[in-house]
Regions:
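Short, motif-level signal for alpha-helix interfacial/capping segments enriched in acidic residues
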Residues: 104-109, 239-243, 276-287
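Intramembrane catalytic core of multi-pass membrane enzymes that act on lipidic substrates
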Residues: 64-189
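Short alpha-helical catalytic segment bearing the HExxH-like zincin motif
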Residues: 121-125, 244, 294, 298, ...
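Cytosolic/stromal cytosol-facing helical appendages immediately following the last transmembrane segment
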Residues: 2-19, 23-28, 135-138, 143, ...
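Membrane-helix interface/capping segments
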Residues: 54-68, 267
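Alpha-helical bilayer-embedded segments of polytopic membrane proteins, i.e.
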Residues: 8-56, 73-98, 106-120, 214-257, ...
Length: 378
């Protein structure tokens, strides 16, 4: 069913996407009470939303593409107001937890592991929505969220590399067939930073500017991250810095788990001479699970996001199996499966093979695609 702009614009239809704000009180409860409450954040984020997916099912409705930014006001406010909310939660908890005598070391670690689940699952995801906008304020807010998890270069890598080269050998975050997450993760950590740096360097070179020019966003990335480090130290000393770095590490791990899932085994056809077919919905895994899409502001409609990157999350379209490959479960379940390589391959490899047979029956030798050994795109 297609939802009219008038229907989409109603505040009550945006409200389910604000469920992520309910995670912040759980973080506060964990810090105040300690004990078993320190597991609330990962349990709710990973398992409760998975149970909700089973309860509420799929959402295959699509918003009318004629919906304007004014129609999407309430949805936009969710991503904008998350930024100060996360800032206050993160640094407020550093100030409270670092010197807290009622919490032992393991409890403090567990609390900030949970905080990293939030800043990764929600914060980085919201930064992804914000960085794609033309509005300078929204883009700056996206940078602020990434600085809080020490992963600012993700913006450059995502916009300049991933979207341009997805499903080709030049894209570091397209997971290869049979590549486990444990091989994917260290490879991506190394390659993404360098690909982001090289992309910005190339852009400056085209303007006859050196890489040290003040317009290089890496200066801003460094400044924002330094501010976060200094604030963590001012509020919690070296313990505060340690807790800040811990949550950042967890957040980055959460992001790259999602990156691993989104394009696993999917490749664009090499047309020869370093040329590849255009990106289509079939080059990203789609998931229509309603509750986890509330949490992730429709990130699981990833097929449409790559097909039309300028669409805001409320108007991202769902695709059927005829147009895009489908994940069997939402991201919370799939990220858990990704941590277990045998389970992951048992679930996903047959689906990749089905995708290949469906869209590319003419390709009989996939070895170069599996190893990302085809020529780099021009």
């Amino acid at each position: 069913m297609t939802l009219s702009p008038e229907t989409v614009a109603k505040a009550q239809n945006a409200l389910p996407f604000a469920m992520s704000f309910l995670l912040i009180p759980l973080a506060i409860v964990s810090a105040i009470f300690g004990g078993w409450t320190v597991i609330l954040l990962p349990v709710v984020t990973w398992y409760m939303f998975s149970i909700m997916d089973l309860a509420v099912g799929l959402n295959t409705d699509n918003a009318d593409l004629e919906a304007t930014d004014d129609d999407l006001f309430w949805y936009r406010m969710i991503t904008v107001f998350w930024v100060p909310a996360q800032f206050l939660m993160l640094f407020g908890l550093i100030a409270y937890v670092a010197p807290a005598e009622h919490l032992n070391t393991l409890e403090k670690i567990a609390i900030f592991f949970g905080v990293g689940v939030i800043t990764g699952t929600v914060g980085i995801n919201y930064s992804h929505e914000l960085m794609h906008q033309k509005n300078k304020l929204e883009r700056w807010l996206g940078d602020a969220l990434l600085a809080m998890v020490l992963y600012s270069h993700f913006r450059s890598e995502h916009l300049l590399v991933h979207h341009r080269y997805v499903a080709t050998p030049r894209d570091p975050v397209t997971a290869r067939m049979n590549e486990t997450f444990y091989r994917f993760y260290p490879r991506v950590l190394k390659q993404c930073f360098m690909s982001a740096w090289n992309a910005e360097k190339a852009m400056l070179a085209r303007k006859d500017l050196p890489v040290t020019d003040s317009s290089n966003p890496f200066w801003k990335y460094a400044y924002l991250q330094l501010v976060c480090f200094l604030l963590a130290f001012a509020l919690g000393g070296w313990v505060g810095v340690g807790l800040f770095v811990l949550q950042a590490g967890v957040a980055i791990w959460q992001l790259e788990l999602v990156n691993y899932i989104e394009h696993y085994g999917l490749t664009r056809k090499h047309l020869g001479d370093g040329k590849y077919e255009h990106v289509q919905p079939r080059h990203s895994w789609n998931a229509a699970h309603k509750a986890s899409n509330w949490l992730l502001i429709n990130l699981q409609r990833h097929s449409d996001h790559h097909y039309k990157p300028d669409r805001r999350f409320p108007v991202l379209q769902n695709y059927t199996e005829a147009d895009a490959p489908q994940l069997p479960y939402g991201y919370p379940v799939m990220t858990i499966a990704a941590m277990m390589p045998k389970v992951w391959k048992r679930v996903m490899n047959p689906r990749v093979q089905k995708w290949r047979d469906m869209y590319y029956p003419e390709i009989t030798d996939w070895s170069a695609y599996n190893k990302a050994a085809n020529p780099l795109p021009r």
